[in-house]
Amino acid sequence: MDGRPVRLLSGALHYFRVHEGHWDHRLAMLRAMGLNCVETYVPWNLHEPRPGVFRELAVLGRFLDAVGRAGLLAIVRPGPYICAEWENGGLPHWVTGPLGRRVRTRDPEYLRAVDGWLAAVLPQVVPRQCDRGGPVIMVQVENEYGSYGSDAGYLAHLAGRLRALGVTVPLFTSDGPEDHMLTGGSVPGLTATVNFGSGAREAFATLRRHRPDGPLMCMEFWCGWFSHWHTGPGGEDAEVMEATEAGQAGETAEAGAVAKAGEAGEVGEVGEGGVRDAADAAAALAEILECGASVNIYMAHGGTSFGGWAGANRAGALQDGALLPTVTSYDYDAPVDERGRPTAKFWRFREVLAPYAEGPVPAPPAPQPVLAAAAEVRLTGWASMDAVLDGLGGPEVWSGAPPTFEELDVDRGVVRYRLSVPGPRAPYELRVRGVRDRAVTFVDGAPGPVLDTEEAVLGPVAGPAEVELWVESLGRVNYGPRLGEAKGITGGVLHERQYLHGVRARGLRLDAVEDATAVARLVFEEPRPGARGLHRGTVVVPAGGVGDAVLELPGWTRGFVWVGGFPLGRYWSAGPQRSLYVPGPCLREGANEVLVLELEGAAPGTSGPGRPSANRPGTDGSGTNGPGTDGSGTNGPGTDGPSVEAPRLVP
């Protein structure tokens, strides 16, 4: 840089996972750890929700300007695919829906969409390159492509488009340090980097077999890990979780690098999940630097997957097993936690990085304000799911077979499927094929069980009957061969062996709840805490009391929350995440509107899931609620657990 060698001491911080009001503080925290650079992905699906409709692209430019003001360099990874534990790996549903396996190849239809994306986003990057006085020092081509494909022509096309659109700083690729990954993911003439969490000498030796010359860099030094719903140390899905991590991280024999010691404590809002010992991580970081390499700490500050944008993985070494949806918190056991606080890992890393820094490492900035006192949300109204769908949903579509989310233009949200069982006919099981991912059911208006496996069974059901299935996406897969798979009912509904045709489907996109005018037109009834539907309320923050907080929802089951119009993300009583992070800039003194979209429902006197699962203990296999329920679709009186309470903000 300017004719002199530069060792990049970088940390990952995704601008879209941090409230803009916190950027300056988080960037200052990275500098105080001893870093001189920040890396960010750019999620295509966040910025182009529909073909040719772009939103908030300027936020990337503002972030890069903040990086420059902080005295940091920037690495930009614009996709089109980003992984990042992000919905669909950053690919828009309107791309993967019609194209399927043709994505991430030189397919002409896919490349037209990609070229449009790059042409739209790069004007935020090109003027901010370091050779023009800005902070951007490197730009990535695709992302870990060697873990997915082998289309060298596709990678060459992307590199050519980046250059044609004005990128003059070095281009690079990043892959696992395995021969087949570097062979599939590298581009001749471009810098190749590797991603791993330990074993730097072995990883760089592999890279040197492919690139005898050039800089060494670990583009993703995995200092922690992420968590999935329904998982945790010692939990029923712990082995599945570890197998998934071994598959993804195990591109470099990474299975043992992420500890599951349950020592997260107060790290982020997860409390349990993948954590890594600070001393172990610091030693691995030191080994990278001792090799003379540059590094990007993934994550330096993880933040939060606001707005229901968290992705999912598939279990197994080849990521082709059961769905494992990722929690809302992206704390990642990073050195700077979800709330921007330094952890033990921060101080360990600072000690390792300080000798390599150019000049003294600055002190950390002052902590961000914290909510002065707990405050309860006063619920003022409730609208049923049918009312919400009528007011905020898309048009109802008739189809011979169930349309997918993609066909209904639903990225995140739910779809209501209605179908008729002809009659008279004997009671047979209803087999729902390809459920992705979770369905709340009704038969002739009576609640049935929740379907939570891809090949699910409901019934027996006699005809004639009317059936409703409210299917929710728990997050599209962001890594592996199941990338881009459709959501909804993807394989049809059968009564005995007969397909039921003539399906009426209507979708509700999550972002529809962010339309304040449309929400204001809904007819709200008296509050019904914990019931399925949209709950409206207010929380009052006293003068001088605004600051970071967490939102607790005791007894609620699963859904999404908005505070002051800001989408916090998904909550789920399944755990391990028990509360949602509320950035202080979302709040204001006085009354703040709160919206809670509860998708499953829990009855007063319960705290767990409001209905039995069709595939778990607690149902009698009849297609209706089994013993211990009152038939209302929620647990009946007398069940154990604390009652449903009003949501509350806690410092």
What residues fall within each predicted segment?
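Active-site neighborhood of glycoside hydrolase catalytic domains
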Residues: 109-187
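Aromatic- and acidic-residue-enriched segments that line the glycan-binding/catalytic groove
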Residues: 51-58, 69, 80-104, 155, ...
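N-terminal carbohydrate-binding accessory modules
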Residues: 1-37
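The substrate-binding groove and active-site-proximal loops of carbohydrate-active enzymes
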Residues: 8-19, 42-60, 96-115, 140-152, ...
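Aromatic-lined substrate-binding rim segments of carbohydrate-active enzymes
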Residues: 23-87, 159-164
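Aromatic-lined ligand-binding clefts that engage carbohydrates, nucleic acids, or primary amines
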Residues: 427-442, 540-563, 571-572, 594-597
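Glycine/proline-rich low-complexity spacer/linker segments in large multi-domain proteins
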Residues: 473-506, 601-610, 636-651
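Catalytic-core region of carbohydrate-active enzymes that cleave or remodel glycosidic bonds
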Residues: 68, 195-242, 271-337, 341-348, ...
